[in-house]
């Protein structure tokens, strides 16, 4: 794409477009990859990336590829809703982790993806791509499916129109996923079986704030080692309900809506 053919954007808009190209599948990128995904000319991206690197928003590796810098993550932690959510949720996450020793995580909606805002993991847990700051696919994760199931029609339509495959188990049929989302909303939990990463299964439940709004999802991620993960559903549902009550007491979720955004 040339400067002339690039969509008209402000400098801030172009910088944000560059940062938005980074996600769980694109943690490290070349300039060419960033330019392609941001739909910006390479010369423009080169200038923007250089400035972002100077501000510690991006970090350049020895191989020349770039990744998100610590400044972006630190700024994200200052978002009041994420900070309060993490503070209230951590004791509940730790309780379940101590009992089962599997990774616990909390996610919120971030555009057409879910953002992992907190995760607890130990030596036995899987080394998968869900870490604090990760932006993961809504249709391939337990926490993502919960958020998607409770999202508005615009969000669901946008996601259903673009179902990337991550493993052989990833659901890429819009009709199948739409039916599953309806079931998730009714039954109150989501389960995944190696849909984002091979060897990983998950269960997730909604977290509600004031007014009954679903403002986040609580998930447990475990190795697919033959255990009946279904036995954890009641534990997760009870924990989710107790945590939701605390979130209401904390005043979170007053006007939260799960909707699509640019």
Residue ranges and their predicted role:
Residues 201-205:
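Short hydrophobic beta-strand micro-motif common in sensory/regulatory domains
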Residues 174-175, 180, 187, 198-199, ...:
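Juxtadomain coupling helices with adjacent low-complexity linkers
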Residues 207-209:
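Sensor-regulatory modules in signal-transduction proteins
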Residues 106-111, 119-120:
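Short hydrophobic alpha-helical segments used for membrane anchoring or interfacial signaling
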Residues 125-196, 262:
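Short, solvent-exposed recognition segments
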Residues 48, 88-99, 183, 187, ...:
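Amphipathic alpha-helical regulatory segments at dimerization interfaces
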Residues 1-82, 86, 244-249:
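N-terminal helix-turn-helix
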Residues 71-99, 125-128:
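Conserved segment of winged-helix/HTH DNA-binding domains
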């Amino acid at each position: 794409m040339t400067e002339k053919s690039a969509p008209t954007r402000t400098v801030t808009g172009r910088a944000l477009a560059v940062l938005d190209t980074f996600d769980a599948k694109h943690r490290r990128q070349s300039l060419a990859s960033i330019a392609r995904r941001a739909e910006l000319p390479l010369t423009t991206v080169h200038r923007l990336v250089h400035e972002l690197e100077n501000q510690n928003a991006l970090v350049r590796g020895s191989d020349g590829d770039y990744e998100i810098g610590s400044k972006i993550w630190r700024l994200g932690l200052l978002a009041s809703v994420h900070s309060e959510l993490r503070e209230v949720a951590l004791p509940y996450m730790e309780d379940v982790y101590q009992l089962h020793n599997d990774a616990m995580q909390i996610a919120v909606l971030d555009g057409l993806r879910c953002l992992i805002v907190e995760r607890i993991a130990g030596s036995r847990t899987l080394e998968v791509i869900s870490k604090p700051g990760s932006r993961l696919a809504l249709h391939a994760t337990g926490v993502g499916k919960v958020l998607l199931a409770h999202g508005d029609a615009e969000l669901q339509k946008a996601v259903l129109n673009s179902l990337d495959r991550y493993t052989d188990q990833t659901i890429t049929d819009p009709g199948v996923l739409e039916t599953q989302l309806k079931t998730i909303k009714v039954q109150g939990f989501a389960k995944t079986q190696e849909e984002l990463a091979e060897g990983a299964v998950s269960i997730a439940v909604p977290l509600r704030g004031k007014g009954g709004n679903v403002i986040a999802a609580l998930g447990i991620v475990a190795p697919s080692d033959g255990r009946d993960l279904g036995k954890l559903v009641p534990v997760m549902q009870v924990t989710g309900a107790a945590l939701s009550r605390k979130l209401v007491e904390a005043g979170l979720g007053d006007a939260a809506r799960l909707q699509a955004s640019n």
